[in-house]
């Protein structure tokens, strides 16, 4: 699961989207709560209607100054624990970078991740890059089938010059090359009642936040 933190679009008169990319992997601290967290991801209302506000996805690492508060508080200001640069501007450690919205600013979301590896799909070994997908941005009671969406395409020598005849170690651009079937797999989600699996390989099934089916690659 991810901890979701909704922030206001502006801070000190600056549009926070101009530096949100630089915040990935950086630590932040709540000015009033003292809670410390690391930013793993950021999503925007432009990413889809499910995102109501600019949302930071964080992992909390330190509880508050009273050792009781474990998450940021509504409306509080966030302080940068690292240093970032965007354009010609530097925000140093100890400076403020954002403020939480005034109500219902924090929640727990659900996420599924897959590590880098090789899957055997349709008779072919397919390399899969490390990736994650947020199932629901503000709740951890999600219900989905999660797996890999498969894209098959024919790649010709015109698309990939490495497919031209390279006898004796030299590319012969006058000789036709062999076309190849390219399979790409992307982590994706489907509703539980969507059983159209022509281009989908299910890996895990989640119902109301609980794992019901887990398939090994």
Where are these regions (language model features)?
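Subunit-assembly interface segments of extracellular/virion macromolecular structures
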Residues: 1-217
